[in-house]
Amino acid sequence: MRKLLFALLLASPILTFAQGSQVNTQGIRALGMSGAGSALFVDETSIFYNPGALVKSANNAISVGASAVMFRSAFQEVNSNVQHDTKFQISPPFSIFASFGPKDSWWKAGIGVYTPFGGSVDWGTEWPGKFELNHLALRAIYIQPTLSFKLTENFGIGGGFVYNVGSVDLSRSLPVFDQNGNPGRAELSGIGTGMGYNLGVHYHLEDEFAISLSYRSHVRTKLEDGDAEFTVPEALGSSFPTTKFSAELPLPSSFNVGLSFPLNDRLDLAGDATFIGYSIYKELVFDYEQNTPVLSDTKQTKKYENALSGKVGLNYHASDKLDLRAGAGYVYTPVRSQYVYAETPDNNRLMGSIGFTYILSDKFDLSGAYTFQRVMERTTTNAETRLSGTYKTNIHAPGISLTYKW
């Protein structure tokens, strides 16, 4: 009973960048190429993609961007013809990047505020997995001051300190019922913090090619004094007291290699390969401040595996004012079949993107992009909850950014 009631799924947020919970919409230019471009694009978004490239940017700049991530998933239980769909929701990850330093100097500094992890999903209270999850909303905001140095005209290095502020809000039904047959409800919310770093090296050989190597450390987000509230029949109130809880969510590290080559005077080809260290996420432990015979501290097995992603994209210089982009990618899931949960009904996925940048003036650029991700259909039986069925998931994510340069 305890295991059924309180294997609460704080776990991974919705995943829209590489799996698990990453949202790769920090740079709208790169988004238009499915996340490729860490070697090609040298601008203020390099704070995120590769701090070593930041020093090579020609201008100081401030860039503000936002996306509308629309996650739609459907579930059909084994031996049933009824399909249950998530409610339509929009998650708005955002990014703000600013770079500054002397023109043509050997150094440049910057700061980024962005949301690499986050999302929301709402299954409602009537689907077969209501005792697993009703809804989840999670966001991790990274604040990253960065320094970048030019060792030679072609070789740059850089690094940034990352401070994370994360929030979570989730609910699920409880298998205790009132006199009208309505199930109970558990609601958890809280804020956590963590720290990490981002390192990068960027090398280019005139107009022939560029290579990018970058590493983002894992961040252990510690959530303390979260609020746990329970709606149950009055007779069970003492077994489900309103209380506090703590938990720790390890957000994964990643190592990225990017390459770019000019195919001709107008067309560039870029590719990125990313290794993501999800194996750090082995279990999720909840420590409740107040325990009862029913409400005890719990441990939920995750056993995530490391994952890989590959992206390739084209950037076409259509005119002096307009660049057009397209890209595609394939991503391997870190989630093992027996540990698929409703908050991450994940599998390997295909993605495709288009995008543009239009130069409004000497000072302003406008970029836009749209990416679609098709998560492969997955039929699974959860090892702990025994929920068995097939998940189908699509993700749409348009985005826009405005850059001011000086």
Task: For the regions a language model picked out, list residue spans one by one.
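Transmembrane beta-strand segments of Gram-negative outer membrane beta-barrel proteins
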Residues: V23-G37, V55-R72
